């Protein structure tokens, strides 16, 4: 999955960019306060995208 598609999915489901790290962008779900890092690679493995969504408690892409 492309990173831009995952970021779009996160934003559509109410998540916000919390902060920028060295190699990661940290997204937060303001509804439940959960945070998770999203790597800046152009391509993400499907299991990684599922894990990010599960950590933020949003639907899978």
Language-model features, listed with the residues they occupy:
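Major-groove DNA-recognition helix of helix-turn-helix-type DNA-binding domains
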Residues: 13-29
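Intrinsically disordered and other compositionally biased segments
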Residues: 6-8, 27, 56
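Hydrophobic alpha-helical segments, especially transmembrane helices
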Residues: 3-4, 24, 41, 52
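Absolute protein N-terminus
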Residues: 1-2, 61
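Amphipathic alpha-helical segments
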Residues: 2-15
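C-terminal structural segments of small proteins and small subunits
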Residues: 12-13, 30-61
